[in-house]
């Protein structure tokens, strides 16, 4: 009896030591996405890594956070710079905090970029931005998609752009974004 109690206490102590060293669940992105757990980490901290991410077929994935100046407002945006990241976007993200969102960066220059709200469960603003940082168009309050919505009923928007920024619904109006406004976006190596 005494031996099993001692072994149980040792095992419990080891478990507690391991738990104390593990990061808190809120400090890591959601397992189903590479970088869509919001709010985003501060951009001056190292990129977060997620092991076993299904979007990246088991490889570690990085979440790059970029600050983009929009007038007097600084936005903190997760960067989607690969096809897999752009394809996943903000799917299944229940809430986008004020001043945060996602920057979709594309290779090449300004082209017609089409977006849809497949599996996007919160309404969004889509800000289409040219390669020189000029806002071309803002699609405000694009409706969320309910589970089971047929593809032909899912909201879609498109415009000429190199970058597309997704923000929470009505956020572009709140911070004063307008077509023709200049944003300051650091170069992104899009693939």
Protein language model regions, located:
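Hydrophobic helical h-region of N-terminal Sec-dependent signal peptides
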Residues: 10-18
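Cleavable N-terminal signal peptides
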Residues: 13-14, 24, 58
């Amino acid at each position: 009896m005494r031996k099993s109690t001692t072994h149980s206490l040792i095992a419990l102590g080891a478990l507690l030591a391991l738990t104390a060293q593990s990061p808190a669940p809120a400090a890591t992105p959601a397992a189903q996405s590479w970088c869509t757990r919001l709010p985003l980490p501060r951009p001056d901290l190292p990129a977060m890594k997620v092991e076993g991410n299904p979007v990246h077929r088991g490889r570690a994935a990085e979440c790059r956070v970029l600050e983009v100046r929009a007038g007097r407002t600084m936005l903190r945006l997760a960067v989607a710079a690969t096809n897999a990241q752009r394809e996943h976007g903000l799917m299944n993200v229940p809430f986008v905090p004020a001043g945060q969102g996602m920057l979709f960066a594309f290779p090449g220059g300004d082209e017609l970029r089409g977006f849809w709200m497949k599996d996007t469960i919160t309404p969004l603003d889509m800000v289409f931005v040219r390669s020189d940082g000029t806002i071309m168009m803002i699609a405000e309050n694009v409706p969320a998609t309910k589970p089971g919505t047929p593809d032909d009923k899912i909201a879609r928007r498109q415009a000429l752009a190199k970058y597309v920024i997704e923000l929470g619904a009505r956020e572009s109006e709140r911070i004063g974004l307008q077509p023709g406004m200049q944003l300051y976006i650091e170069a992104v190596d899009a693939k």
